[in-house]
Amino acid sequence: TTRTFAAFDLDETEEERRYRHAACLLTDIGWRAHPEYRGTQSLNIIAHASFIGVDHPGRVFLALATAFRHEGVFIDTIAPALTGLVSDRYLERARILGAMLRVVYLLTASMPGVMPRLRWEKRAGGVLALVIPAALVNLYGERPAGR
């Protein structure tokens, strides 16, 4: 995700980078939950977890990034009580990370070695495109196209 955030021209503090990395590690925490409830259950698990070295805004960022990954980024009703605990900057980054994970997880099927082969590229007019190598083109289908 470091290369992706660079492609998006998003600057990060060391703490934000650490939280982004942690969110990537936690994003599949609710894998056993029913898909209709996975986002909410993951959000609740992370929001109420006892992490060391994570402040309240950081915990909310982690929870929201995972919720946005499962529920979509255009839903403003996700945990309104929690969104008030984070800055607009954290909320924006949670949405971006959640959106990125939402697309990439469909392409990787959570299998190791696939994600490093994908990359985001900035094109004319500021358009961002996900570049999929020819060897992985069969992973691209209707669901990733819709996201």
Predicted regions and their residues:
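Divalent metal-dependent catalytic cores for phosphoryl transfer on phosphate-bearing substrates
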Residues: 5-120
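Low-complexity, glycine/alanine/valine/leucine- and proline-rich hydrophobic stretches
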Residues: 110-147
